[in-house]
């Protein structure tokens, strides 16, 4: 289960004020670039998106603001900016493909084709770009017309710039000469990968210390006479650094960076400064598009000004016709798929609290699907994504996407009943968790801690070995919330296996098999 960090509330927008502000910003950016060339300065602009997650058409914010975002609107904005600014670059900061049926059906190639169509100069790997496994990822590399920038990833003894096969496309950094100035772009990925993704999906790739990799890349880029260094980092704004977003410490420890473009944390942060580095983050799903303006003195070649802002992609931006023409067949096919009915719900099914009906239903369906694939289990440990109750009526594929928004693989392992108790006890400390250990009853001891398991009215011996299924995200630690679980499953005796079955597919298959739930 991937945790999505909620962005700050988008304030109410006064239409007239926004239009005036946007027009002024656009005019300033455009006239500023041209006026700079008339004097003894020149502006190089960098346009950036991040965490598109396969969104092509408008969507909603987490707070419910509708009809915003989508790559098709970002494309319109970027084309407009390019007309205003003759010297520009366009980059994406990761998590490009995972998140929508239309992207999933194409294996992500549609999104990469759209980046190619718009002439992106580079994109950076995000953690969710690994979700579909190494074969799909390598297809994306082969498809990409631009380099994939990630300095802090290794494969065995090989480093970026020294990979073979499709991975040749992955470089630590690239240099682009724009308007006579050399702009180095260095990519970084979050070091949180091993706490979310199993080795089978990473395909031998490992994230290394981003500060060490960045320092080496900056040294190389400056040695190649870079006039400015821009970092595209799939690590984002947080109130404080954490294991997945150590942005403050990285920029504190590494000199020579002028701009940091952030991703991963799904925040709209138009402009902030850390250790004299200008930072910007353009939210998620194309809801904002970001722009950096770097102004250089033409005589000294020094960087004399840096500015950053983001723009809300609402209905003031048309859907780009070229993007829509390329995406339309896939969008129409996805619409048909999403409308497919998979089951009928006969009565409300609760989705709140530990042991809720929806979590229990998921566990039952996962078990049944694994059994049909010759992988029977004794237990399933899983929860919901806080999507609420299921109401009576038809249940469609679209509903299944809301219930399970990620393609997390099912993992099986052989553990003792005592191990399962330890797993449940660890999860009990997570106040927002509704994970359920099906089909067991967890009996609390003195103090309320889980003390024993019961099944069909009898205690389960602590040393009994049982095969349990859970999703790969939880098996890897659930974002470091389940480190004891990770340790238990990593033991050789657990015989841990990652199945080729993802949880949403298991849900859909199980519902189709049942036909009626409730």
Locate the predicted segments by residue.
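N-terminal secretory signal peptides
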Residues: 1-13, 21-27
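Acidic, metal/ion-coordinating pockets
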Residues: 2, 19, 35-315, 357-368, ...
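Catalytic centers of hydrolytic enzymes
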Residues: 40-64, 69-77, 83, 196, ...
């Amino acid at each position: 289960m991937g945790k999505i960090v909620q962005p700050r509330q988008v304030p109410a927008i006064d239409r007239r004020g926004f239009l005036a502000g946007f027009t002024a910003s656009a005019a300033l950016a455009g006239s500023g670039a041209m006026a700079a060339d008339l004097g003894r300065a020149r502006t190089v602009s960098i346009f950036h998106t991040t965490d598109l997650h396969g969104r092509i058409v408008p969507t909603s914010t987490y707070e419910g603001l509708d009809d915003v975002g989508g790559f098709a609107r970002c494309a319109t904005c970027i084309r407009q900016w390019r007309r205003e600014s003759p010297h520009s670059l366009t980059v994406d900061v990761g998590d490009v493909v995972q998140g929508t049926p239309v992207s999933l059906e194409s294996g992500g190639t549609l999104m990469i084709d759209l980046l190619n169509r718009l002439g992106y100069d580079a994109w950076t790997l995000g953690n969710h770009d690994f979700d579909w496994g190494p074969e799909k990822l390598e297809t994306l590399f082969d498809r990409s017309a631009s380099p994939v920038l990630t300095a802090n990833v290794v494969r065995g003894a090989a480093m970026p710039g020294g990979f073979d096969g499709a991975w040749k496309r992955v470089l630590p950094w690239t240099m682009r000469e724009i308007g006579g100035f050399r702009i180095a772009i260095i990519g970084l990925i979050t070091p949180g990968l091993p706490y979310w993704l199993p080795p089978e999906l990473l395909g031998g790739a490992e994230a290394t210390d981003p500060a060490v990799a960045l320092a080496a890349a900056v040294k190389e880029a400056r040695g190649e006479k870079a006039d400015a260094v821009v970092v595209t980092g799939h690590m984002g704004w947080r109130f404080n650094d954490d294991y997945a977003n150590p942005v403050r410490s990285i920029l504190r420890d590494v000199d020579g960076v002028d701009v940091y473009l952030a991703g991963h944390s799904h925040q709209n942060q138009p402009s902030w400064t850390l250790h004299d580095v200008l930072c910007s983050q353009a939210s998620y799903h194309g809801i904002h598009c970001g722009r950096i303006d770097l102004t250089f003195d033409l005589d000294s070649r020094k960087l004399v000004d840096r500015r950053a802002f983001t723009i809300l992609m609402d209905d003031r931006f048309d859907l780009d016709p070229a993007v829509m023409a390329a995406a339309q067949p896939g969008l129409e096919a996805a619409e048909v798929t999403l409308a497919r009915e998979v089951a009928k719900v006969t009565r409300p099914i609760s989705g709140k609290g530990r042991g809720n009906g929806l979590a229990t239903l998921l566990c039952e369906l996962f078990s049944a699907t694994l059994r049909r694939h010759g992988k029977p289990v004794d237990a399933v440990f899983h929860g919901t994504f806080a999507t609420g109750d299921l109401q009576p009526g038809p249940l469609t594929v679209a509903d299944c996407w809301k219930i399970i928004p990620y393609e997390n693989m099912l993992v099986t392992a052989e553990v003792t009943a005592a191990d399962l108790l330890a797993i449940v006890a660890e999860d009990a400390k997570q106040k927002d968790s509704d994970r359920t250990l099906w089909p067991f009853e967890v009996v609390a001891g003195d103090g309320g801690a889980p003390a024993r398991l019961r099944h069909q009215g009898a205690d389960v011996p602590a040393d009994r070995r049982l095969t349990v299924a859970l999703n790969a995200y939880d098996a890897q630690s659930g974002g470091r919330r389940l480190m004891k679980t990770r340790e238990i499953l990593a033991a050789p005796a657990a015989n841990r296996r990652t199945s080729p079955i993802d949880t949403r597919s298991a849900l859909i298959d199980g519902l189709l098999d049942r036909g009626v739930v409730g």
